[in-house]
């Protein structure tokens, strides 16, 4: 059964979501995970890719898009057929619950304080429960930066 974690951020802006993604990806890669980040569009995937390559002044997070030949520990896709054949960890930044979600061993949802994102998150939380997955909540609003 997959482990699903919802990270509730204190901010409403997308930038904080991408900053947290960089931290989460760094920890996951250090722990030996291969990440698949699912987005809603190619444009958003490219934007996230750029952010990860420039994640911090002293490091970068190697990643690739399905349209590239590069084999990196982070794959960023936007269509169901982009999901890897050997799924490990999913970071779902899309507005949907991909049907292959239950095939991953770890799942992360990064939630910002936007009305649209919060409404989608409530729906996805129920979808996880419907799939037999009991999500864990991590309220980052209660932690200092």
Q: Each predicted region: which residue ranges?
A:
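Hydrophobic/aromatic beta-strand patches that form the interior of the parallel beta-sheet core
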Residues: 7, 91, 108, 136-138
């Amino acid at each position: 059964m997959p482990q699903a974690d919802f990270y509730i951020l204190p901010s409403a802006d997308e930038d904080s979501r991408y900053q947290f993604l960089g931290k989460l990806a760094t920890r996951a890669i250090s722990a030996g995970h291969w990440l698949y980040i699912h987005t809603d569009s190619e444009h958003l995937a490219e934007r996230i890719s750029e952010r990860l390559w420039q994640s911090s002044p002293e490091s970068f997070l190697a990643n690739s898009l399905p349209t590239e030949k590069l084999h990196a520990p982070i794959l960023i896709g936007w269509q169901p057929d982009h999901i890897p054949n050997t799924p490990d960890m999913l970071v779902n930044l899309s507005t949907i619950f991909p049907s292959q979600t239950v095939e991953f061993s770890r799942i992360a949802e990064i939630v910002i304080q936007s009305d649209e994102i919060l409404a989608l998150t409530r729906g996805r939380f129920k979808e996880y429960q419907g799939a037999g997955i009991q999500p864990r909540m991590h309220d980052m609003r209660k932690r200092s930066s």
